[in-house]
A protein has these predicted regions:
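Structural/interface elements that position substrates and couple domains in central-metabolism enzymes
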Residues: 1-307
Length: 307
């Protein structure tokens, strides 16, 4: 498939072959970056980052990735400083920014915002998170981290823990993992179960186990992917208070785990992983942060047609 000009909106738009290709390009770029320090593939190209929601890792990692490719970055990190406050529509904002840039990365609280942006522009659009819907670039860096750690994705038993109802990272990741030969364990409070339509889709492809019992599931897992319970996604404060602090990954829990279990987290965390886990061989979440740069370099380079 032609990558130049391609939008990156949802993992549903990717085949397993597409994913594997991105991971190979990312691995190559990681090696080149370590060897040369900086690259010039995107010299003269401009990335526009449109972040209508707060972000630390995703925004900085895209900016770092573009700089590592030799390109430039413009954009904003809050809608408060833009004409959106004056009532400008998302479509008009995106059309305006298109005139200044070669590729757009957008994060927005509205589901479907990234696809809308892609429909009104001629340049590639990359989804950095749209509401509780999708976060495809996080998924790709998660898969990259798993593959670089285990040497494979097929054959692994992977648990997704926490807010599976509103968490866009786990929605995207589960759908991508279903393209592989894996076993999925969906671990959450009853109120935060994975949406039924996603579970049905997963069951058509891979074995899926739903449970509220973290301690019972942990001994089976190769990877435990932890998510925070996101207060900002709850329409009702009382619903949030019922599930707040439902689980914590700590050393006591990890004594029940396989020796080579890896704990992942898209970050930020609150109290769902105790800091005592950070210094163990189980902790993989800061390696995940690093993976964001080569993976996003690959996506930017491919969609710009410079790699």
């Amino acid at each position: 498939m032609e990558w130049k000009g391609r939008d990156v909106i949802s993992v549903r738009d990717f085949s397993k072959g597409d994913i594997e290709f991105v991971l190979k390009v990312a691995e190559r770029l990681e090696g080149e970056l370590k060897e040369k320090g900086s690259l010039n593939y995107a010299a003269g190209k401009i990335l526009a980052t449109l972040f209508f929601e707060p972000s630390t890792r995703t925004r900085l990692s895209f900016e770092s990735a573009m700089h590592c490719l030799g390109g430039s970055v413009i954009g904003f990190s809050s809608a408060a400083s833009t004409s959106v406050r004056k009532g400008e529509s998302l479509a008009d904002t995106v059309r305006t920014v298109e005139q200044y840039s070669d590729v757009i990365v957008i994060r927005h609280p509205m589901e479907g915002a990234a696809r809308l942006a892609a429909e009104v522009t001629e340049i590639p659009v990359i989804n950095a998170g749209d509401g509780s819907n999708q976060h495809p670039t996080q998924t790709l860096l998660d898969l990259y981290t798993i593959k670089r750690t285990f040497g494979r994705i097929d054959g692994l038993s992977i648990g997704l823990l926490g807010d599976l109802k509103y968490g866009r990272t786990v929605h995207s990741l589960a759908q991508a993992l279903a393209l592989y030969d894996v076993e999925l364990h969906l671990i959450s409070p009853e109120l935060l179960r994975m949406p039924g339509h996603i579970v049905e889709e997963l069951r058509d492809r891979v074995p899926v186990h739903e449970t509220t019992d973290l301690e019972g599931a942990v001994p089976e897992l190769d990877v435990l992917y932890v998510t925070r319970i996101q207060r900002e996604r709850f329409p009702d404060e009382q619903e949030y208070l019922k599930v707040k602090g439902s689980y914590q990954v700590n050393l006591r829990l990890l004594r029940k785990a396989k020796e080579n279990l890896k704990v992942m987290h898209p970050l930020p965390r609150v109290d769902e992983i105790h800091p005592e886990v950070d210094g163990t061989e189980h902790a993989l979440y800061f390696r995940q942060v690093f993976s964001g740069v080569p993976v996003r370099m690959a996506l930017l380079g491919l969609t710009l047609g410079v790699i």
